[in-house]
Design a protein with these regions (language model features):
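Short acidic/polar hinge/loop motifs at secondary-structure boundaries
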Residues: 134-161, 249, 472
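Membrane-embedded beta-barrel scaffold of Gram-negative outer-membrane proteins
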Residues: 315-329, 435, 443, 476-530, ...
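Gram-negative outer-membrane beta-barrel transporters
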Residues: 406, 500, 504-509, 529-609, ...
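A beta-strand signature from Gram-negative outer-membrane beta-barrel systems
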Residues: 148-189
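C-terminal beta-signal and adjacent terminal beta-strands/loops
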Residues: 554, 606, 627-686
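Short, acidic, small-residue-rich periplasmic hinge/interaction motif at the N-terminus
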Residues: 47-86, 94, 124
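Flexible loop and strand-edge segments within Gram-negative outer membrane beta-barrel domains
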Residues: 227-248, 254-316, 322-340
Length: 686
């Protein structure tokens, strides 16, 4: 069920897509009923199913097993399409990378269920998150952002490594993750997905779209999830996963003509999490340690592209985005509340000077307003950023592209930005793609990136401990250089092709927000400070994909990370970062395309804990079976089938009120094996 058109860039029309669904809570039942009524008048629209076929669309190759591999893009980019997302339950963005060798996803703590990603051996804060080419999910939205994007809503995920284009700003350091949502102009009808797992987590998703005429389309996307099980599988007295409720609603409109593209989206989100000591473990002689996270988020974005008539390849684009994020956290006696308001605007002009030369220039404005309140014994002194503060950054950029057929592409870019907090700074970036022969493609990139650090807003799950939190009052802007080399080889072997990719990336920080656990400030302290010394990351990865027999494709990958930072004058391996990772995936689809079987095995390497001691390597296995029918499919799967989990995920769980209590040293699974079942439904004719 993979349908792809050109993605909305200032010069072309955006893509269209299908969707999913999941849930069984009363709130979700109401959502489904509302959606069914809203879509009762939809017209039928023919849609070609290309889940089994290969197509070539403007230099992009679409494969059922491996998503979309970029052929002509100058950057090292992988596009994960719905065909690959459907190989697992993929309830949200955080569960979309289980079969991806480049991106690691792990839990941030053992209390709130927050997930974090790592790319090139570094924290997800150094990955620029985009939604449809617009910077998003920043600052206070980072800690739980991977759970804010329902998997069935996604048309594709684009993962770009290394320095990114200057068009999207200056914040990309290790790469970008760009989320493409389902588009209203794609199809008529409704689609849904329902999901239930052995931990009694329920999900429901539903979307419907309507074409009012040949230019104007609208859609409504709904998501709800509910988990209320008070489960303590390891017997430490704390819930393994939080009780959680979430609602997520998006309304989209698109106007598409030969000379104008306009897209409007409004989104509402509410997320409630409750965890801590389980009810049966509460001791009458000791207060219950509770954890609560209550979040509301609202977004709106408007994208416009005007194609200038009589000037092929020339367009003017205006992109606007605004968000309001309000979160309230409770960790025992510690309280932290944060409200972030963000406004973003970009105006861009792009033109093809001739068949070899392209020029893009533009200007952007980003404004962030924070209002923070921190209280409790966890803070040694008043949090220095408490109260309201803001930052406005205005910038301009130019990017030139030289392209010599399919053989050579050179893309230098430069932007200048001025921040009300950090003054002016320059962001240079360069990408080169060279294909000496048709079988081999070489890429190189180098560029600088910057970030404005927000110690607690971006790292809130770290408050799930008894440590005293100390934040330096002179935090500086984070800066880093990233350099990368990659090679892609497509080697014919008989009638099949072996795809081999090798890449190396090096990231070096000029300044960094260093999070020092139990360091020179004393035991049981959490100290946020500037970098005093060196900090870098080396990443080497090799992966290969080969169709073993008809319908059966295997992918094997190996990655090595060497990430080190200076703590208290000593250069040490970054804690909770595995030295290596191995991945093997097998995907088989029967000749009739009615059955699909997917298996993914991972070997996660050893690493260091906060005290510089080692944690061991461990393996994981997940599998899924999918049965296709005409208007629906049923899938049954399991995660962590090796049943491996950390024996003691929470240190000091017997007395959470003592300084040694720590729920943040999570290096592996906190839950055992889990099985799930779900159904995907698609009605294109009502």
């Amino acid at each position: 069920m993979l349908h792809i058109k050109n993605m909305v860039c200032p010069r072309c029309v955006m893509a269209a897509r299908g969707i999913l669904i999941t849930h069984m809570d009363p709130i979700i039942s109401k959502i489904i009923c509302t959606m069914l009524m809203a879509t009762a008048c939809l017209r039928a629209a023919a849609q070609t199913d290309t889940i089994y076929k290969e197509h070539k669309l403007q230099g992009i190759e679409v494969k059922a097993t491996n998503g979309i591999k970029s052929k002509n893009r100058v950057g090292n980019t992988e596009i994960i399409g719905q065909a690959q997302l459907f190989r697992a339950a993929c309830c949200n963005l955080g569960e979309s990378f289980t079969a991806n060798p480049s991106v690691d996803v792990s839990y941030s703590d053992a209390a709130t269920g927050a997930r974090q990603i790592k790319l090139l051996g570094l924290s997800g804060t150094y990955v620029q998150m985009l939604t449809e080419n617009i910077p998003n999910l920043r600052g206070a939205g980072i800690p739980y952002s991977l759970g804010y994007v329902p998997g069935p809503w996604m048309q594709s995920i684009q993962v770009s490594k290394g320095a990114a284009s200057v068009k999207n700003g200056y914040e990309s350091i290790t790469g970008q993750i760009d989320i493409e949502y389902l588009k209203p102009q794609g199809t008529d009808g409704i689609r849904g997905n329902a999901y239930l797992d052995s931990n009694l987590k329920q999900e429901a998703n539903l979307d419907g779209s309507i074409h009012l005429n040949d230019r104007l389309s609208g859609s409504l996307l709904l998501h709800g999830e509910n988990r209320q099980r008070d489960h303590d599988g390891n017997g430490d007295g704390f819930m393994d996963m939080p009780r959680q409720k979430q609602y997520n609603v998006m309304n989209r409109w698109a106007y598409v003509s030969s000379g104008l593209i306009s897209q409007l989206a409004i989104r509402l989100l509410g997320d409630q999490r409750s965890s801590g000591m389980s009810s049966h473990a509460a001791n009458h002689d000791m207060r219950r340690y509770g954890v609560d996270v209550n979040t509301h988020r609202y977004e709106a974005q408007w994208k416009n592209a005007l194609m200038l008539q009589g000037r092929p390849g020339t367009s003017i684009a205006l992109m606007l985005h605004g968000s309001w994020h309000d979160a309230h956290y409770t960790f025992g006696d510690t309280r932290y509340n944060v409200t972030q308001k963000n406004g973003y605007a970009q105006l861009m002009y792009e033109t093809d000077l001739d068949e070899h030369h392209n020029l893009a220039v533009g200007t952007s404005l980003n404004h962030d307003y924070y209002d923070e309140l921190a209280s409790g014994a966890a803070f040694a002194s008043p949090y220095p950023a408490a109260g309201s503060h803001s930052e406005s950054t205005i910038g301009a950029y130019a990017q030139y592209t030289y392209k010599l057929g399919e053989q050579l592409t050179v893309m230098p870019g430069l932007r200048y930005d001025h921040s009300t907090l950090y003054g002016g700074f320059v962001t240079p970036r360069l990408h080169v793609k060279y294909a000496p022969v048709s079988l081999l493609t070489l890429r190189a990139s180098v560029g600088k990136g910057y970030r404005s650090p927000h110690a607690l807003a971006e790292n809130t799950p770290l408050l799930a401990s008894g440590r005293t939190c100390i934040v330096a009052n002179d935090l500086k802007q984070e800066t880093a250089w990233n350099m990368g080399l990659s090679a892609a080889l497509n080697l014919p072997i008989g009638s099949k092709t072996l795809e081999v990719n090798a890449e190396y990336y090096y990231t070096r920080f000029g300044n960094q927000l260093v999070i020092n656990f139990d360091g020179a400030r004393g035991d049981h302290t959490l100290f946020f400070d500037n970098l005093h010394g060196r900090s870098y990351s080396h990443t080497l990865q090799v992966d290969a994909t080969y169709p073993l027999v008809e319908g059966l494709t295997a992918t094997a990958a190996w990655r090595y990370n060497d990430a080190r930072t200076t703590y208290d004058g000593q250069l040490r391996q970054r804690p909770l970062t595995s030295l290596y990772k191995g991945l093997l995936t097998l995907s088989y689809k029967t000749p009739t395309a009615l059955w699909q079987f997917d298996v993914t095995g991972q070997l996660n390497g050893k690493g260091k804990l906060y005290d510089n001691s080692d944690y061991p390597a461990y393996g994981q296995l997940q599998a899924q079976v999918t049965r296709e029918f005409r208007h629906f499919s049923v899938y049954l799967g399991g995660e962590n089938l090796t049943n491996y989990r950390i024996a003691r995920p929470i240190v000091g769980a017997e007395n959470p009120w003592q300084p040694s209590f720590d729920a943040t040293q999570i290096w592996g699974p906190t839950e055992g094996a889990m099985v799930y079942i779900g159904i995907r439904i698609k009605f294109e004719t009502l």
